[in-house]
Amino acid sequence: MSARKSTTGSKPASTKSRITSKQATRSKAAKHNGKVHTIGSYLVQRLQDYGVTDLFGIPGDFVLQFYVTYCVGGLSLCNSIAGAYAEKSPVIVISGAPGMSERATDPLLHHRVKDFHTQRDVFEKITVATALLDDPMTAFLEIDRCLEACVRFKRPVYLELPRDCVHKQAVIPHVPDDSQPVSDSNALRESLAEAKELIEASKKPVIIAGVEVHRFGLREEVLGFAEKFKIPMCATILGKSVVSESHPLYLGVYEGAMGRSEVQKYVEESDCVILLGTFMTDINLGIYTAHLDPGKCIYATSEKLRISYHHFHDVIFSDFVTALEKQKMKVVTRKIPDNVRPQQLEFKVKPAQPVTTKHLFESINQILTDETVVVTDVGDCLFGAVDLMINTHTKFLSPAYYTSMGFAIPASLGAQVANQNLRPIVLVGDGAFQMTCLELSTALKLGFNPIVIVLNNKGYTTERFLQEGPFNDIPDWKYHNITDLIGGGWGFEVSTEGDLEKAIKAALANKDSLSVINVHLKPTDVSPALTRLADKMSKTL
Protein backbone atom coordinates (compact mmCIF):
# COMPACT_ATOMS: atom_id res chain seq x y z
CA MET A 1 0.00 0.00 0.00
CA SER A 2 1.19 3.49 -0.73
CA ALA A 3 -0.25 6.50 1.03
CA ARG A 4 0.30 10.19 0.56
CA LYS A 5 -1.12 13.36 2.05
CA SER A 6 -1.64 16.57 0.15
CA THR A 7 -2.04 19.91 1.87
CA THR A 8 -3.60 23.20 1.00
CA GLY A 9 -4.00 26.63 2.51
CA SER A 10 -6.70 27.86 4.85
CA LYS A 11 -10.24 26.67 4.15
CA PRO A 12 -12.98 29.18 3.39
CA ALA A 13 -16.19 29.09 5.38
CA SER A 14 -18.55 26.42 4.13
CA THR A 15 -22.00 27.03 2.75
CA LYS A 16 -24.63 24.84 4.40
CA SER A 17 -27.84 23.72 2.79
CA ARG A 18 -30.94 22.03 4.08
CA ILE A 19 -34.17 21.55 2.19
CA THR A 20 -37.06 20.11 4.16
CA SER A 21 -40.22 18.51 2.84
CA LYS A 22 -42.49 20.26 5.32
CA GLN A 23 -45.41 22.36 4.18
CA ALA A 24 -44.49 25.99 3.84
CA THR A 25 -45.46 28.54 6.43
CA ARG A 26 -47.47 31.43 5.08
CA SER A 27 -45.43 34.50 4.15
CA LYS A 28 -46.60 38.02 4.84
CA ALA A 29 -48.90 38.62 1.87
CA ALA A 30 -47.29 41.05 -0.53
CA LYS A 31 -45.09 42.77 2.07
CA HIS A 32 -41.39 42.20 2.76
CA ASN A 33 -39.85 44.00 5.76
CA GLY A 34 -42.71 46.46 5.55
CA LYS A 35 -42.16 47.05 1.84
CA VAL A 36 -44.12 45.77 -1.14
CA HIS A 37 -42.68 42.48 -2.40
CA THR A 38 -40.84 42.33 -5.68
CA ILE A 39 -40.84 39.16 -7.75
CA GLY A 40 -37.28 38.43 -6.62
CA SER A 41 -37.87 39.10 -2.91
CA TYR A 42 -41.09 37.07 -2.92
CA LEU A 43 -39.32 34.11 -4.51
CA VAL A 44 -36.60 34.24 -1.84
CA GLN A 45 -39.25 34.54 0.90
CA ARG A 46 -41.17 31.52 -0.37
CA LEU A 47 -38.00 29.44 -0.60
CA GLN A 48 -37.32 30.28 3.04
CA ASP A 49 -40.91 29.39 3.93
CA TYR A 50 -40.23 25.89 2.59
CA GLY A 51 -37.04 25.56 4.64
CA VAL A 52 -34.50 26.33 1.90
CA THR A 53 -31.44 28.05 3.35
CA ASP A 54 -28.79 27.77 0.62
CA LEU A 55 -28.42 27.37 -3.13
CA PHE A 56 -26.11 25.39 -5.39
CA GLY A 57 -24.80 27.53 -8.23
CA ILE A 58 -23.64 26.84 -11.76
CA PRO A 59 -20.59 28.98 -12.74
CA GLY A 60 -21.10 31.59 -15.43
CA ASP A 61 -21.65 35.28 -16.07
CA PHE A 62 -24.81 35.68 -14.04
CA VAL A 63 -27.50 37.66 -15.82
CA LEU A 64 -29.27 38.55 -12.59
CA GLN A 65 -29.20 38.03 -8.83
CA PHE A 66 -29.84 34.29 -9.03
CA TYR A 67 -27.55 31.33 -9.48
CA VAL A 68 -28.03 29.51 -12.77
CA THR A 69 -26.81 31.18 -15.96
CA TYR A 70 -29.15 31.17 -18.96
CA CYS A 71 -28.70 28.13 -21.28
CA VAL A 72 -24.98 27.38 -20.73
CA GLY A 73 -25.70 26.85 -17.04
CA GLY A 74 -29.30 25.74 -17.23
CA LEU A 75 -28.83 23.18 -19.97
CA SER A 76 -25.82 21.76 -18.11
CA LEU A 77 -28.30 20.71 -15.42
CA CYS A 78 -30.47 18.62 -17.71
CA ASN A 79 -29.06 15.17 -16.98
CA SER A 80 -29.18 15.55 -13.21
CA ILE A 81 -32.65 17.10 -13.31
CA ALA A 82 -33.86 14.26 -15.53
CA GLY A 83 -32.57 11.83 -12.90
CA ALA A 84 -34.34 13.77 -10.16
CA TYR A 85 -37.59 13.59 -12.13
CA ALA A 86 -37.23 9.85 -12.72
CA GLU A 87 -36.43 9.08 -9.08
CA LYS A 88 -38.75 11.67 -7.52
CA SER A 89 -36.30 14.04 -5.89
CA PRO A 90 -37.71 17.54 -5.29
CA VAL A 91 -35.35 20.12 -6.84
CA ILE A 92 -36.00 23.77 -7.64
CA VAL A 93 -34.16 25.15 -10.68
CA ILE A 94 -34.00 28.96 -10.78
CA SER A 95 -32.53 30.36 -13.97
CA GLY A 96 -31.71 33.87 -14.97
CA ALA A 97 -32.73 34.99 -18.44
CA PRO A 98 -32.35 37.96 -20.76
CA GLY A 99 -34.70 40.84 -19.99
CA MET A 100 -38.06 41.09 -21.71
CA SER A 101 -37.13 44.48 -23.15
CA GLU A 102 -33.99 42.98 -24.71
CA ARG A 103 -36.03 40.37 -26.54
CA ALA A 104 -38.11 42.88 -28.47
CA THR A 105 -35.70 43.09 -31.42
CA ASP A 106 -34.84 39.36 -31.31
CA PRO A 107 -31.07 39.92 -30.84
CA LEU A 108 -28.48 37.13 -31.03
CA LEU A 109 -27.42 37.39 -27.39
CA HIS A 110 -24.62 35.13 -26.18
CA HIS A 111 -25.80 31.87 -24.54
CA ARG A 112 -28.94 31.86 -26.69
CA VAL A 113 -29.60 28.59 -28.57
CA LYS A 114 -32.61 28.71 -30.90
CA ASP A 115 -34.98 31.27 -29.45
CA PHE A 116 -35.71 32.71 -26.03
CA HIS A 117 -38.05 29.83 -25.18
CA THR A 118 -35.58 27.00 -25.90
CA GLN A 119 -34.36 26.39 -22.36
CA ARG A 120 -37.84 26.48 -20.85
CA ASP A 121 -39.11 24.12 -23.57
CA VAL A 122 -36.37 21.64 -22.66
CA PHE A 123 -37.13 21.78 -18.94
CA GLU A 124 -40.85 21.26 -19.54
CA LYS A 125 -39.98 17.68 -20.52
CA ILE A 126 -38.07 16.88 -17.31
CA THR A 127 -39.91 18.83 -14.60
CA VAL A 128 -43.37 18.66 -13.10
CA ALA A 129 -43.98 22.42 -13.45
CA THR A 130 -42.33 25.41 -15.17
CA ALA A 131 -42.96 29.14 -15.11
CA LEU A 132 -41.64 32.29 -16.76
CA LEU A 133 -41.79 35.03 -14.13
CA ASP A 134 -42.22 37.96 -16.51
CA ASP A 135 -45.51 39.47 -15.32
CA PRO A 136 -46.09 40.90 -11.81
CA MET A 137 -49.80 40.13 -12.21
CA THR A 138 -49.14 36.38 -12.41
CA ALA A 139 -45.58 35.78 -11.14
CA PHE A 140 -46.47 35.44 -7.46
CA LEU A 141 -49.16 32.85 -8.16
CA GLU A 142 -46.81 31.00 -10.51
CA ILE A 143 -44.11 30.84 -7.83
CA ASP A 144 -46.59 29.32 -5.38
CA ARG A 145 -47.88 26.85 -7.99
CA CYS A 146 -44.43 25.55 -8.86
CA LEU A 147 -43.12 25.27 -5.31
CA GLU A 148 -46.29 23.49 -4.18
CA ALA A 149 -45.95 21.06 -7.10
CA CYS A 150 -42.33 20.36 -6.16
CA VAL A 151 -43.31 19.38 -2.62
CA ARG A 152 -46.51 17.56 -3.55
CA PHE A 153 -45.11 15.43 -6.39
CA LYS A 154 -41.48 15.22 -5.16
CA ARG A 155 -40.19 16.19 -8.58
CA PRO A 156 -38.16 19.09 -9.99
CA VAL A 157 -39.64 22.42 -11.05
CA TYR A 158 -38.20 25.19 -13.20
CA LEU A 159 -38.50 28.95 -12.65
CA GLU A 160 -37.12 31.41 -15.19
CA LEU A 161 -36.67 35.02 -14.11
CA PRO A 162 -35.76 37.68 -16.71
CA ARG A 163 -33.24 40.13 -15.37
CA ASP A 164 -35.44 43.19 -15.82
CA CYS A 165 -38.26 41.54 -13.82
CA VAL A 166 -36.38 40.83 -10.58
CA HIS A 167 -37.38 44.11 -8.96
CA LYS A 168 -40.88 44.43 -10.38
CA GLN A 169 -43.29 45.00 -7.50
CA ALA A 170 -46.56 43.25 -6.78
CA VAL A 171 -49.49 44.97 -8.47
CA ILE A 172 -52.15 43.53 -6.17
CA PRO A 173 -51.90 41.95 -2.69
CA HIS A 174 -51.12 38.24 -2.84
CA VAL A 175 -51.57 35.59 -0.14
CA PRO A 176 -50.39 31.99 -0.74
CA ASP A 177 -53.07 29.33 -1.02
CA ASP A 178 -52.31 26.73 1.66
CA SER A 179 -55.13 24.34 0.75
CA GLN A 180 -54.16 20.69 0.29
CA PRO A 181 -55.69 17.98 -1.92
CA VAL A 182 -57.82 15.35 -0.17
CA SER A 183 -58.65 11.75 -1.00
CA ASP A 184 -62.00 10.60 -2.27
CA SER A 185 -63.45 9.25 0.99
CA ASN A 186 -65.42 6.45 -0.67
CA ALA A 187 -62.46 5.24 -2.72
CA LEU A 188 -60.20 5.38 0.35
CA ARG A 189 -62.69 3.43 2.47
CA GLU A 190 -63.20 0.70 -0.14
CA SER A 191 -59.48 0.35 -0.86
CA LEU A 192 -58.73 -0.09 2.83
CA ALA A 193 -61.48 -2.69 3.17
CA GLU A 194 -60.09 -4.72 0.27
CA ALA A 195 -56.53 -4.40 1.55
CA LYS A 196 -57.60 -5.54 5.01
CA GLU A 197 -59.46 -8.53 3.57
CA LEU A 198 -56.45 -9.61 1.50
CA ILE A 199 -54.02 -9.24 4.41
CA GLU A 200 -56.21 -11.06 6.94
CA ALA A 201 -56.77 -13.95 4.55
CA SER A 202 -53.04 -14.39 3.95
CA LYS A 203 -50.73 -16.78 5.78
CA LYS A 204 -47.45 -15.26 4.69
CA PRO A 205 -47.74 -11.52 3.99
CA VAL A 206 -44.65 -9.43 3.31
CA ILE A 207 -44.02 -5.71 2.79
CA ILE A 208 -41.73 -4.35 0.06
CA ALA A 209 -40.94 -0.74 0.95
CA GLY A 210 -39.77 1.57 -1.81
CA VAL A 211 -38.15 4.96 -2.08
CA GLU A 212 -41.45 6.87 -1.94
CA VAL A 213 -41.78 5.87 1.71
CA HIS A 214 -38.76 8.09 2.29
CA ARG A 215 -39.69 10.79 -0.22
CA PHE A 216 -43.12 11.33 1.36
CA GLY A 217 -41.95 11.06 4.97
CA LEU A 218 -43.90 7.87 5.72
CA ARG A 219 -41.17 5.74 7.28
CA GLU A 220 -42.68 5.81 10.78
CA GLU A 221 -46.14 4.89 9.47
CA VAL A 222 -44.87 1.98 7.38
CA LEU A 223 -42.66 0.70 10.18
CA GLY A 224 -45.53 1.09 12.65
CA PHE A 225 -47.81 -0.92 10.34
CA ALA A 226 -45.24 -3.71 10.06
CA GLU A 227 -44.62 -3.83 13.81
CA LYS A 228 -48.31 -3.66 14.73
CA PHE A 229 -49.26 -6.64 12.58
CA LYS A 230 -45.90 -8.51 12.72
CA ILE A 231 -45.39 -8.42 8.95
CA PRO A 232 -41.83 -8.99 7.63
CA MET A 233 -40.33 -6.26 5.46
CA CYS A 234 -38.03 -5.95 2.45
CA ALA A 235 -36.76 -2.95 0.56
CA THR A 236 -35.96 -2.32 -3.07
CA ILE A 237 -32.44 -1.31 -4.03
CA LEU A 238 -33.64 2.25 -4.75
CA GLY A 239 -35.36 2.26 -1.36
CA LYS A 240 -32.52 0.52 0.51
CA SER A 241 -32.25 1.74 4.14
CA VAL A 242 -35.77 3.17 4.13
CA VAL A 243 -35.87 1.28 7.45
CA SER A 244 -33.00 0.07 9.61
CA GLU A 245 -31.62 -3.16 8.18
CA SER A 246 -30.96 -4.48 11.66
CA HIS A 247 -34.68 -4.39 12.51
CA PRO A 248 -35.93 -7.88 13.51
CA LEU A 249 -38.67 -7.80 10.84
CA TYR A 250 -36.29 -6.83 8.04
CA LEU A 251 -35.41 -9.54 5.51
CA GLY A 252 -33.15 -7.74 3.05
CA VAL A 253 -33.27 -6.20 -0.41
CA TYR A 254 -35.68 -7.85 -2.82
CA GLU A 255 -34.53 -7.52 -6.42
CA GLY A 256 -35.20 -10.85 -8.06
CA ALA A 257 -32.13 -12.92 -8.83
CA MET A 258 -29.75 -10.08 -7.94
CA GLY A 259 -30.73 -10.37 -4.29
CA ARG A 260 -30.08 -13.27 -1.97
CA SER A 261 -31.98 -16.38 -3.03
CA GLU A 262 -33.46 -16.82 0.46
CA VAL A 263 -35.11 -13.38 0.24
CA GLN A 264 -36.35 -13.99 -3.29
CA LYS A 265 -37.88 -17.32 -2.28
CA TYR A 266 -39.59 -15.88 0.82
CA VAL A 267 -41.14 -12.97 -1.09
CA GLU A 268 -42.23 -14.93 -4.14
CA GLU A 269 -43.88 -17.59 -1.96
CA SER A 270 -45.92 -14.91 -0.17
CA ASP A 271 -49.68 -14.94 -0.64
CA CYS A 272 -49.92 -11.18 0.00
CA VAL A 273 -47.16 -8.84 -1.17
CA ILE A 274 -47.69 -5.28 0.07
CA LEU A 275 -45.71 -2.91 -2.16
CA LEU A 276 -45.58 0.57 -0.64
CA GLY A 277 -43.95 3.38 -2.59
CA THR A 278 -42.13 0.94 -4.84
CA PHE A 279 -41.02 1.69 -8.40
CA MET A 280 -41.48 -1.39 -10.59
CA THR A 281 -38.27 -0.73 -12.54
CA ASP A 282 -35.97 -3.20 -14.27
CA ILE A 283 -33.25 -2.65 -11.65
CA ASN A 284 -35.64 -2.98 -8.69
CA LEU A 285 -36.94 -6.18 -10.27
CA GLY A 286 -33.47 -7.65 -10.81
CA ILE A 287 -33.46 -7.09 -14.58
CA TYR A 288 -36.93 -8.66 -14.65
CA THR A 289 -35.92 -11.83 -12.83
CA ALA A 290 -38.53 -11.08 -10.15
CA HIS A 291 -41.80 -13.00 -10.18
CA LEU A 292 -44.71 -11.34 -8.37
CA ASP A 293 -48.33 -12.36 -8.96
CA PRO A 294 -50.39 -9.14 -9.37
CA GLY A 295 -53.44 -10.95 -8.04
CA LYS A 296 -51.70 -11.34 -4.68
CA CYS A 297 -50.34 -7.78 -4.48
CA ILE A 298 -51.35 -4.54 -2.81
CA TYR A 299 -49.58 -1.88 -4.86
CA ALA A 300 -49.66 1.68 -3.50
CA THR A 301 -47.63 4.64 -4.77
CA SER A 302 -48.19 8.36 -5.17
CA GLU A 303 -49.46 7.71 -8.71
CA LYS A 304 -51.34 4.43 -8.47
CA LEU A 305 -53.31 2.27 -6.04
CA ARG A 306 -54.16 -1.30 -7.00
CA ILE A 307 -55.53 -4.04 -4.74
CA SER A 308 -55.20 -7.31 -6.64
CA TYR A 309 -56.74 -6.38 -10.02
CA HIS A 310 -58.91 -3.54 -8.69
CA HIS A 311 -57.71 0.02 -9.38
CA PHE A 312 -58.64 2.94 -7.12
CA HIS A 313 -58.44 6.58 -8.15
CA ASP A 314 -58.17 9.83 -6.19
CA VAL A 315 -56.61 8.17 -3.15
CA ILE A 316 -53.60 10.06 -1.82
CA PHE A 317 -50.66 7.78 -1.02
CA SER A 318 -50.02 9.23 2.44
CA ASP A 319 -53.72 8.94 3.35
CA PHE A 320 -53.76 5.27 2.39
CA VAL A 321 -50.56 4.40 4.28
CA THR A 322 -51.56 6.35 7.39
CA ALA A 323 -55.02 4.76 7.46
CA LEU A 324 -53.60 1.29 6.82
CA GLU A 325 -51.54 1.55 10.00
CA LYS A 326 -54.68 2.43 11.98
CA GLN A 327 -56.73 -0.56 10.77
CA LYS A 328 -57.92 -3.18 13.24
CA MET A 329 -56.78 -6.60 12.09
CA LYS A 330 -55.84 -9.83 13.76
CA VAL A 331 -52.18 -10.07 14.73
CA VAL A 332 -50.31 -13.25 13.87
CA THR A 333 -46.72 -13.86 14.93
CA ARG A 334 -44.79 -15.31 12.00
CA LYS A 335 -41.44 -17.03 12.34
CA ILE A 336 -38.79 -15.76 9.95
CA PRO A 337 -36.23 -18.43 9.03
CA ASP A 338 -32.77 -17.54 10.33
CA ASN A 339 -31.19 -17.89 6.90
CA VAL A 340 -33.46 -15.21 5.39
CA ARG A 341 -32.44 -12.26 7.56
CA PRO A 342 -29.21 -10.43 6.62
CA GLN A 343 -26.11 -11.56 8.47
CA GLN A 344 -22.63 -10.11 8.79
CA LEU A 345 -20.17 -12.90 8.17
CA GLU A 346 -16.83 -13.00 9.93
CA PHE A 347 -13.72 -13.04 7.79
CA LYS A 348 -9.99 -13.08 8.40
CA VAL A 349 -7.61 -10.76 6.61
CA LYS A 350 -4.86 -12.46 4.60
CA PRO A 351 -2.34 -9.62 4.27
CA ALA A 352 -0.59 -10.84 1.11
CA GLN A 353 -3.77 -11.98 -0.67
CA PRO A 354 -4.82 -9.80 -3.65
CA VAL A 355 -7.97 -7.93 -2.75
CA THR A 356 -11.22 -9.12 -4.36
CA THR A 357 -14.53 -7.35 -4.84
CA LYS A 358 -16.18 -9.72 -2.36
CA HIS A 359 -13.55 -9.00 0.29
CA LEU A 360 -13.79 -5.26 -0.38
CA PHE A 361 -17.50 -5.17 0.41
CA GLU A 362 -17.02 -7.40 3.45
CA SER A 363 -14.47 -4.89 4.72
CA ILE A 364 -16.74 -1.92 4.03
CA ASN A 365 -19.54 -3.64 5.96
CA GLN A 366 -17.36 -3.62 9.07
CA ILE A 367 -16.92 0.18 9.16
CA LEU A 368 -20.54 1.31 8.72
CA THR A 369 -21.95 3.13 11.75
CA ASP A 370 -24.77 5.50 12.63
CA GLU A 371 -22.45 8.34 11.61
CA THR A 372 -21.79 7.11 8.06
CA VAL A 373 -23.87 7.36 4.91
CA VAL A 374 -23.15 5.10 1.94
CA VAL A 375 -23.27 6.85 -1.43
CA THR A 376 -22.80 4.54 -4.39
CA ASP A 377 -22.42 5.11 -8.09
CA VAL A 378 -23.63 2.97 -10.99
CA GLY A 379 -22.04 -0.34 -11.90
CA ASP A 380 -20.75 -3.18 -9.77
CA CYS A 381 -20.29 -0.78 -6.86
CA LEU A 382 -24.11 -0.49 -6.80
CA PHE A 383 -24.74 -4.21 -7.14
CA GLY A 384 -22.14 -5.07 -4.51
CA ALA A 385 -23.62 -2.53 -2.09
CA VAL A 386 -26.90 -4.48 -2.04
CA ASP A 387 -25.41 -6.82 0.57
CA LEU A 388 -24.15 -4.06 2.87
CA MET A 389 -26.03 -3.80 6.16
CA ILE A 390 -27.20 -0.23 6.83
CA ASN A 391 -28.09 -0.10 10.51
CA THR A 392 -29.74 3.32 10.50
CA HIS A 393 -32.58 4.39 8.26
CA THR A 394 -32.02 6.63 5.22
CA LYS A 395 -28.24 6.17 5.20
CA PHE A 396 -27.90 4.81 1.66
CA LEU A 397 -28.04 6.87 -1.54
CA SER A 398 -27.90 5.60 -5.11
CA PRO A 399 -29.29 6.37 -8.58
CA ALA A 400 -30.69 2.85 -8.84
CA TYR A 401 -33.40 3.73 -11.36
CA TYR A 402 -31.99 6.44 -13.64
CA THR A 403 -28.49 4.92 -13.24
CA SER A 404 -26.46 7.85 -14.50
CA MET A 405 -22.74 7.27 -14.02
CA GLY A 406 -20.87 9.95 -12.12
CA PHE A 407 -23.56 10.31 -9.44
CA ALA A 408 -21.72 9.37 -6.26
CA ILE A 409 -19.07 12.04 -5.70
CA PRO A 410 -21.38 15.03 -6.33
CA ALA A 411 -24.14 13.30 -4.34
CA SER A 412 -21.81 12.82 -1.37
CA LEU A 413 -21.15 16.55 -1.48
CA GLY A 414 -24.88 17.23 -1.28
CA ALA A 415 -25.31 14.70 1.53
CA GLN A 416 -22.63 16.33 3.66
CA VAL A 417 -23.88 19.84 2.91
CA ALA A 418 -27.26 18.71 4.27
CA ASN A 419 -25.82 16.97 7.35
CA GLN A 420 -22.22 17.57 8.31
CA ASN A 421 -22.53 15.10 11.18
CA LEU A 422 -22.51 12.26 8.63
CA ARG A 423 -19.38 10.98 6.91
CA PRO A 424 -19.95 9.71 3.37
CA ILE A 425 -18.50 6.35 2.36
CA VAL A 426 -18.42 6.82 -1.41
CA LEU A 427 -18.30 3.76 -3.68
CA VAL A 428 -17.41 4.55 -7.27
CA GLY A 429 -16.04 2.68 -10.26
CA ASP A 430 -13.02 3.99 -12.11
CA GLY A 431 -15.13 4.96 -15.13
CA ALA A 432 -17.64 6.95 -13.09
CA PHE A 433 -14.82 8.52 -11.07
CA GLN A 434 -13.33 10.00 -14.23
CA MET A 435 -16.63 11.73 -15.03
CA THR A 436 -17.16 13.85 -11.91
CA CYS A 437 -14.10 13.49 -9.67
CA LEU A 438 -13.33 17.22 -9.68
CA GLU A 439 -16.20 17.80 -7.25
CA LEU A 440 -13.70 16.54 -4.67
CA SER A 441 -12.17 19.99 -5.04
CA THR A 442 -15.44 21.49 -3.79
CA ALA A 443 -15.53 18.99 -0.92
CA LEU A 444 -12.01 20.06 0.04
CA LYS A 445 -12.95 23.73 -0.21
CA LEU A 446 -15.88 23.19 2.16
CA GLY A 447 -13.80 21.17 4.62
CA PHE A 448 -15.69 17.91 4.06
CA ASN A 449 -14.23 14.47 4.75
CA PRO A 450 -15.69 11.77 2.48
CA ILE A 451 -13.91 8.44 2.14
CA VAL A 452 -13.93 7.70 -1.59
CA ILE A 453 -13.29 4.05 -2.51
CA VAL A 454 -12.48 3.61 -6.20
CA LEU A 455 -13.17 0.14 -7.61
CA ASN A 456 -10.33 0.18 -10.13
CA ASN A 457 -11.08 -2.76 -12.40
CA LYS A 458 -9.54 -1.16 -15.49
CA GLY A 459 -12.70 -0.16 -17.29
CA TYR A 460 -16.43 -0.75 -17.56
CA THR A 461 -16.61 -4.21 -16.02
CA THR A 462 -20.41 -4.45 -15.93
CA GLU A 463 -20.53 -3.75 -19.67
CA ARG A 464 -17.87 -6.40 -20.33
CA PHE A 465 -20.46 -9.02 -19.40
CA LEU A 466 -22.71 -7.72 -22.18
CA GLN A 467 -20.12 -7.29 -24.91
CA GLU A 468 -16.35 -7.32 -24.62
CA GLY A 469 -14.33 -4.85 -26.63
CA PRO A 470 -11.77 -2.05 -26.44
CA PHE A 471 -14.60 0.46 -25.88
CA ASN A 472 -14.79 -0.89 -22.32
CA ASP A 473 -11.20 0.13 -21.60
CA ILE A 474 -10.45 3.53 -20.07
CA PRO A 475 -7.24 5.47 -19.28
CA ASP A 476 -5.49 4.01 -16.24
CA TRP A 477 -5.27 6.93 -13.83
CA LYS A 478 -3.40 6.97 -10.55
CA TYR A 479 -6.62 7.78 -8.75
CA HIS A 480 -5.02 8.16 -5.34
CA ASN A 481 -2.90 11.04 -6.66
CA ILE A 482 -5.89 13.30 -7.27
CA THR A 483 -5.27 14.73 -3.82
CA ASP A 484 -2.09 16.30 -5.24
CA LEU A 485 -4.09 17.84 -8.06
CA ILE A 486 -6.72 19.44 -5.82
CA GLY A 487 -4.22 20.39 -3.13
CA GLY A 488 -5.38 18.42 -0.11
CA GLY A 489 -6.56 15.14 1.37
CA TRP A 490 -5.06 11.67 1.66
CA GLY A 491 -4.55 9.16 -1.14
CA PHE A 492 -4.00 5.41 -0.76
CA GLU A 493 -3.13 2.75 -3.33
CA VAL A 494 -4.35 -0.75 -2.48
CA SER A 495 -3.53 -4.12 -4.06
CA THR A 496 -3.77 -6.62 -1.18
CA GLU A 497 -6.07 -7.32 1.73
CA GLY A 498 -3.40 -6.02 4.07
CA ASP A 499 -3.16 -2.79 2.09
CA LEU A 500 -6.92 -2.37 2.28
CA GLU A 501 -7.05 -2.89 6.03
CA LYS A 502 -4.33 -0.27 6.60
CA ALA A 503 -5.87 2.22 4.18
CA ILE A 504 -9.33 1.99 5.74
CA LYS A 505 -7.94 2.43 9.25
CA ALA A 506 -5.91 5.46 8.16
CA ALA A 507 -8.85 7.02 6.30
CA LEU A 508 -11.14 6.60 9.30
CA ALA A 509 -8.53 8.20 11.54
CA ASN A 510 -8.20 11.13 9.14
CA LYS A 511 -11.37 12.92 10.23
CA ASP A 512 -10.33 16.38 9.09
CA SER A 513 -10.07 15.83 5.35
CA LEU A 514 -11.12 13.62 2.47
CA SER A 515 -9.49 10.32 1.56
CA VAL A 516 -9.29 8.51 -1.78
CA ILE A 517 -8.58 4.76 -1.75
CA ASN A 518 -7.56 3.34 -5.13
CA VAL A 519 -8.38 -0.39 -4.97
CA HIS A 520 -6.87 -2.48 -7.78
CA LEU A 521 -9.22 -5.30 -8.87
CA LYS A 522 -9.09 -7.81 -11.70
CA PRO A 523 -11.24 -6.76 -14.69
CA THR A 524 -13.20 -10.02 -14.43
CA ASP A 525 -13.72 -9.90 -10.66
CA VAL A 526 -17.30 -8.96 -9.75
CA SER A 527 -19.54 -8.74 -6.70
CA PRO A 528 -21.64 -11.64 -5.40
CA ALA A 529 -24.82 -9.83 -6.53
CA LEU A 530 -23.64 -9.53 -10.12
CA THR A 531 -22.49 -13.15 -10.00
CA ARG A 532 -25.97 -14.23 -8.85
CA LEU A 533 -27.61 -12.31 -11.67
CA ALA A 534 -25.24 -13.67 -14.32
CA ASP A 535 -25.80 -17.20 -13.07
CA LYS A 536 -29.59 -16.83 -13.15
CA MET A 537 -29.64 -15.26 -16.61
CA SER A 538 -27.30 -17.89 -18.03
CA LYS A 539 -29.90 -20.50 -17.12
CA THR A 540 -32.86 -18.64 -18.57
CA LEU A 541 -31.53 -16.95 -21.73
Where are these regions (language model features)?
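N-terminal cofactor/phosphate-binding cores enriched in small/glycine residues
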Residues: 32-79
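Glycine-rich, acidic loop regions that bind phosphate or pyrophosphate groups
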Residues: 95-141, 161, 239-340, 458, ...
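Conformationally flexible catalytic loops at phosphate/diphosphate-handling active centers
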Residues: 34-35, 117, 139, 145-201, ...
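Structural signature of the thiamine diphosphate
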Residues: 20, 53-54, 68, 73-95, ...
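Active-site diphosphate/adenylate-binding microenvironment
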Residues: 40-44, 48-50, 61, 66, ...
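Glycine-rich, anion-gripping cofactor-binding loops and their flanking helix/strand elements
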Residues: 69-70, 211-300, 391-422, 434-438, ...
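Phosphate/pyrophosphate-binding active-site segments
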Residues: 15, 21-34, 134-137, 172-173, ...
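Thiamine diphosphate
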Residues: 94, 104-114, 219, 256, ...
